[in-house]
Amino acid sequence: MLQQLLNKEKNNITTAQVDFSYLLPEISARIETGAKMILRNQKVDTYSEEYDALSQQYIENNLANFLYSYDEQIYSLYGIFGQQLGKFKYQGGIRIEKSYQIPNLISDTIRIVNDYFNFFPSAHLRYSFSKKSELGLSYSKRITRAGSGELNPFTSYSDPFNLRKGNPYLQPEFINSFDLSYT
């Protein structure tokens, strides 16, 4: 089977970030704060034709044609406080995040909005036994979001032997990471 596939894609990504750090030398501490914004917009227009041996022409394959839009907005604020007390160092922080993922087939009347509000704490502790020996313990919460292709609800026929279809209702993955180290 011969197939022609025309895929037009447009991607826009806008990122803005501001960070502030303030040292408090009188108590051997540091404060950091900041904000970040990420805006993504993607449009995918796919047109497919299959070769018809009888008519010896390419014929439009309506099953494989689609127009897909993906919008993502992530807004976050963070704050961190760290201090050293003799041989002991600690740091604690929090990131607050509001995010939207909007994966939609433009031809579809169903509008899907994945809307999330999350807190991401972190804590790091270190104790120095000597200049060459240190024990550390840390915790952080992270997020992994599905990408636009994983959320695309249209079945891709670009390869007749391997069909792909995303799930627009996929939820993000949250990871609680603990680390114990000795150097």
Question: Where are these predicted regions, by residue range?
Answer:
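Outer-membrane beta-barrel translocator domains and adjoining extracellular loop/strand segments
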Residues: 1, 44-52, 58, 102-109, ...
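Outer-membrane beta-barrel transmembrane domain signature of Gram-negative proteins
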Residues: 3-91, 126-130
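Transmembrane beta-barrel architecture of outer-membrane proteins
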Residues: 11-17, 72-78, 116-122, 165, ...
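Transmembrane beta-strands of outer-membrane beta-barrel pores
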Residues: 37-43, 85-87, 96-102, 139-145, ...
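Outer-membrane beta-barrel signature, preferentially recognizing the C-terminal barrel domain
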Residues: 66-70, 143-183
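Surface-exposed extracellular loop regions of Gram-negative outer-membrane beta-barrel proteins
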Residues: 72-111, 116-122
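Acidic/polar loop patches that form or flank catalytic/metal-binding clefts of enzymes
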Residues: 128, 132-138
